[in-house]
Amino acid sequence: MSIVVFFILICSTKKIHAQTEFDAIMMNKNQFCSGFMYNYSSWEEYWEGTLKRNNENIGTVTSQSVMYMANYGITDNLNIMAGLPYVWNKSSAGTLHEMKGLQDVSVFVKWIPYSFSFDKNKITLFAIGGFSTPVSDYVIDFLPLSIGMGSTNLIGRGMVDYQYKKFTATVSASYIHRSNVKIDRNSYYDTELHLTNEVDMPDVAFYQLRTGFRSKYLIAEALLSRHSTLGGFDISRNNMPFPSNDMDATMIGVNLKHSLKNIPGLELHAGANHTVSGRNMGQATAFNAGAFYVFYFKSKQTAQSGKK
């Protein structure tokens, strides 16, 4: 799974808000947004299967990334977005060396097939599809310091957004199909011996609920997310993780987005999340911050006249 799939950020237009592909916000036609996002996460304890433990041989594992993100409004109801992160991972103890480099490029299409309002309520349905694939030849079989899993992913997501005045609730469900990957050895053992360098990667399901406050200049949300690998196996005792492990996690978090009144088009973003339970995953706490700018490819008057 690439970092981009979980953290790709793009920008809206009607209210000029940064968003993830999980957000119920769309750009206007002919608007383009670009910006950078910084993410920091670390963990010391992790789950070896269901056993929670630490490992003094690696100490604290830290991951950082800087992503460039872009989003374009093809129409008011159809957006295309892309992102590419540079990632560097390291541990505070032991002999494992730092891993860094460009990870996976990601492209998504976001579409509103249906929306309806009644009284002060509004319900909007979204369909999102995309893919991610590695752009560099990074080492896959060096977890937990590998910068990515190395698979090409096809992602499908359905989402429903409910809004009453400034209160919102958004629920989404995603299915991620992952290609097989090749590692730098001719055999490996999961629950049995495989005399090949090709690893069968299990698919992934991802669910999220986000709810909070959405206004013209501010969005504040609480998030509950669940990542479930649909297959795989547990890390064996005192062994390193493997790309096809059964990696599950439940995360809680917050998301804040602020549009500056005195600088139209500029948006600031901040967020945090914490893993509360997991399987074959580190108990990570993460923080992110970013800045984005929105502008029209065509004049605003031209874009508005096209809606008449």
PLM feature spans:
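Outer-membrane pore/translocation modules
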Residues: 96-200
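Outer-membrane beta-barrel architecture
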Residues: 29-35, 79, 83, 102, ...
